[in-house]
Structure formats: structure tokens, C-alpha cells
């Protein structure tokens, strides 16, 4: 059932992409377009997306690939604001986004926040994250797509408090992906940082 549902979503994404001028997509999504394919970087991997059949090389997990196609379809070129929001502050994000916010907090407290900082840095680096100064003990910026950054902020545990943390998005994020897609992006990043395989197929 889930596979049929996924195939249907993929077919819709392909149809929608075919309705745009490719040069228009490239400009709004911040990608390159040449020889019938888009080229872009996603979480440290440079991939090409062939417009004719939406195949992606090198291959990505199916939900990663579908979300990237949605990004190319929905991107409207809105500039990044530099102001961050939580997933629950996303347009229509109260339920789905709030769930991701709580899940991220739990994963930081249980898994990521108890790692030695160098190990967390190594895991973030494997996804191409850039470490940034911030008000948290640890802050990394992941680029899911050229105009879709995600920040992980972690406060490590001490004698008084357990570790805490959150994933954040730029305020412009709803111009590029729906809340459902945003939750997929957050889940993909958390999965890869913890070694879980929920979204890896």
C-alpha cells in the first residue's frame, strides 16, 4: 500500500515539474540546468535530476528523492530571511511540525546531546554541515537544497540539566516545501545523524 501511494506521489511530482519552464525552475530553486538535467547539492551530495523522467544520479533514498522533486516544483525564489522558525511555526505546522519539534528534542536529549562534541561534529560533517557560532553549545547548518537550510542547535548536558536541542528552519522555508516535506527533511537529517534507517529506503 505504502509503495503504491509513493508511486502515485512520484507520478504527480513528475507531472507538475513538466508544467514548468526548466530555466524558471533553475532560477527559483538556485540550481544549474543544462542538457535536460538539474544539478544541485543536497546534504553534501551533488546530484543530477533528469527532467524527462525525474531520475536522480547518484540515487537517493526514495523519500529524499521525492522531497527534492517537490522542492524543484514549489521553489518560488523567495530570498532567505536569516530569521529562524521551529517546525510548529511553519504554515499549517501546528500538528505535524509540533510532532517533529518534540521528536528532535527527544533525539537530542537521548542520543545526540550525550555524544562527545567531536563525534557530533564528525556526524554533522558527513552530511556537509557547516558549524556556526550561536547562543547554543553547538550549532550546525545543513543544506538540504540550495535555498533550504536547516539548523541543529544543541545544549549539552551538565550536572543540573539534561541535554536539549532543536532543529530550525529559515522563515522563507514554506516558499520551498510543504510542512509534510519539511518534516521529511528533518527526519532524514535526524535519521542520518543517529544511524536510524526509518527513511533510508
Model regions and ranges:
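A recognition module on extended beta-rich or small alphabeta surfaces enriched in W/G with H and D/E
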Residues: 170-201
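Generic structural signal for hydrophobic core residues of well-folded globular domains
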Residues: 69-76, 189, 193
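Short Lys/Arg-enriched alpha/beta "domain-start" segment
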Residues: 1-35, 64, 71-130
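Amphipathic, interaction-prone secondary-structure segments
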Residues: 24-51, 130-156
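Conserved binding-pocket/active-site segment within a compact domain
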Residues: 115-175
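Short, charged/polar micro-motifs that form catalytic or ligand-binding hotspots
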Residues: 58, 106, 110, 138, ...
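Intrinsically disordered, low-complexity regulatory segments enriched in Ser/Thr/Pro
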Residues: 45-70, 155-180
Amino acid at each position: 500500500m505504502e509503495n503504491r501511494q509513493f508511486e502515485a506521489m512520484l507520478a504527480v511530482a513528475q507531472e507538475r515539474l513538466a508544467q514548468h519552464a526548466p530555466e524558471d525552475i533553475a532560477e527559483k530553486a538556485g540550481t544549474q540546468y543544462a542538457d535536460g538535467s538539474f544539478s544541485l547539492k543536497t546534504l553534501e551530495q551533488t546530484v543530477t535530476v533528469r527532467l524527462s523522467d525525474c531520475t536522480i544520479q547518484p540515487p537517493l533514498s526514495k523519500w529524499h528523492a521525492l522531497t527534492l522533486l517537490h522542492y524543484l516544483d514549489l521553489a518560488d525564489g523567495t530570498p532567505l530571511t536569516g530569521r529562524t522558525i521551529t517546525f510548529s511555526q511553519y504554515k499549517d505546522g501546528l500538528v505535524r511540525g509540533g510532532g517533529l519539534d518534540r521528536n528532535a528534542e527527544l533525539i537530542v536529549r537521548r542520543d545526540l546531546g550525550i555524544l562527545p562534541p567531536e563525534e557530533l561534529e564528525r556526524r554533522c560533517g558527513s552530511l556537509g554541515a557547516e558549524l556556526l557560532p550561536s547562543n547554543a553549545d553547538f550549532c550546525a547548518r545543513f543544506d538540504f537544497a540550495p535555498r533550504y537550510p536547516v539548523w541543529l542547535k544543541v545544549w549539552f548536558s551538565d550536572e543540573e540539566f539534561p541535554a536539549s536541542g532543536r532543529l530550525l528552519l529559515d522563515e522563507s522555508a514554506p516558499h520551498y516545501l510543504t510542512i509534510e516535506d519539511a518534516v521529511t527533511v528533518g527526519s532524514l537529517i535526524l535519521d542520518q545523524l543517529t544511524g536510524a534507517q526509518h527513511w533510508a529506503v
